[in-house]
Amino acid sequence: NSVVLGKKQRFHSWG
């Protein structure tokens, strides 16, 4: 779960 959250957070930062 932590991995998904980190990936999502990183993607959000890009946008």
Swiss-Prot record:
Coiled coil: none
Highest rank taxon of the organism: Eukaryota
Protein's name according to its UniProt entry: Leucokinin-like peptide
Protein purpose: Acts through intracellular calcium in Malpighian tubule stellate cells to raise chloride conductance.
Swiss-Prot/TrEMBL GO biological process terms: neuropeptide signaling pathway
Record bears the keyword tRNA processing: no
Keyword match Secreted: yes
One GO term describing the cellular component: extracellular region
Lineage: Eukaryota, Metazoa, Ecdysozoa, Arthropoda, Hexapoda
Tissue localization of expression: Expressed in the CNS but not in midgut, ring gland, thoracic perisympathetic organs (tPSO) or abdominal perisympathetic organs (aPSO) (at protein level).
Chain positions found as Glycine amide: 15
Localization per record: Secreted
Keyword annotations of the record: Amidation, Neuropeptide, Secreted
Species of the source: Delia radicum
